[in-house]
Design a protein with these regions (language model features):
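Conserved beta-strand-loop-alpha-helix junction that forms the acyl-donor binding cleft
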Residues: 17-23, 158-169, 185-194
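A conserved beta-strand-loop-helix scaffold within acyl/acetyltransferase catalytic domains
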Residues: 87-105, 109-128
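Recognition helices and adjacent regulatory flanks at domain boundaries
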Residues: 101-104, 115-117, 136-149, 160-162, ...
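A short, aromatic/hydrophobic, helix- or strand-capping loop or linear motif
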Residues: 17, 82-90
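Acyl-donor-binding surface of acyltransferase catalytic domains
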Residues: 1-56, 186
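Conserved active-site alpha-helix within GNAT-family acetyltransferase domains
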Residues: 21-38, 140, 163-181
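Short amphipathic alpha-helix that is part of the acyltransferase structural core
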Residues: 49-84, 195
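Conserved acetyl-CoA-binding loop-helix of GNAT-fold acetyltransferases
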Residues: 1-5, 129, 135-152, 169-174
Length: 195
C-alpha cells in the first residue's frame, strides 16, 4: 500500500541502501510496478573494539600540502568502487586532518579517513592504496593505526567492505573487525523500450 501511495503521488525511488535481506524483498515488491532494481554494491558493515597490533609510527596525519594527492586518490577510490558520488575538492580541504596517510617513494601510497558516525563510533572511510603499492602491507598499517587511534579515544571503529573484494575483507578480519550485517545499494535498472 505504501508503494502504491508513493507512486500515485508522483514519487520515484531512484536507488536505495538497506540491509540486503530487505533490499531483496523490496526488489520483488517493486517489480509489479514496472520498476526493476539490482544490487550494485554488496557490502558488509564491520566493527572493531580491540587493539590487535601496535600502530605503525610511519603513518601520519595529512597536512595542507596533501590536498591534491588525497583528492586524486579519492577520485580513484570512487571509480574503483563504482560509486555514483563524484567528489569535489573543496570539502576535502576542511577535513584534511581526519586523513591518515603513509608515504613511500615521495608520495602518498595509502590512506584512510576517520569520519564521524555516532556518539559511540567513528568510521573508517576512503580506505585506499595505489594499485602499484598493493600487497605490501601499507593498507594494513594505515587501517590498524587509524583503528588504534579511534579505540584510544574510547570509540568503536566501523567500516563498510565490498563483499566482492576478498583481500580487503581478509585484511579487516585479521585486524579484529567483525561482520555485523550485510547491506546493499540497489540501483534502478531502466527497463523502458529502447533503453
Amino acid at each position: 500500500e505504501l508503494l502504491q501511495f508513493l507512486f500515485d503521488g508522483g514519487c520515484e525511488l531512484k536507488n536505495y541502501l538497506c540491509a540486503s535481506e530487505l533490499g531483496y524483498v523490496m526488489q520483488r515488491e517493486l517489480e509489479p510496478y514496472g520498476r526493476r532494481y539490482e544490487e550494485a554494491l554488496a557490502m558488509d558493515f564491520m566493527e572493531a573494539r580491540t587493539v590487535t597490533e601496535p600502530s605503525a609510527p610511519e603513518v601520519e596525519t595529512a597536512g595542507k600540502g596533501d590536498l591534491d594527492e588525497i583528492f586524486a586518490c579519492a577520485q580513484r577510490f570512487v571509480a574503483d568502487c563504482g560509486l555514483l558520488d563524484k567528489p569535489e575538492k573543496e570539502p576535502f580541504r576542511k577535513v584534511l586532518d581526519s586523513f591518515r596517510i603513509l608515504r613511500a617513494d615521495g608520495k602518498i601510497v595509502s590512506m584512510a579517513r576517520i569520519a564521524p558516525a555516532t556518539q559511540d563510533d567513528l568510521r573508517l572511510v576512503l580506505v585506499y592504496t595505489r594499485d602499484e603499492y598493493r600487497g605490501r602491507g601499507y593498507a594494513r598499517k594505515v587501517v590498524n593505526s587509524a583503528k588504534n587511534e579511534i579505540l584510544a579515544a574510547g570509540k568503536r571503529v566501523t567500516l563498510n567492505v565490498d563483499r566482492k573484494k576478498p583481500v580487503s575483507y581478509h585484511l579487516y578480519l585479521s585486524l579484529g573487525f567483525e561482520r555485523m550485517f550485510s547491506q546493499g545499494e540497489f540501483r534502478r535498472v531502466d527497463n523502458r523500450p529502447g533503453s
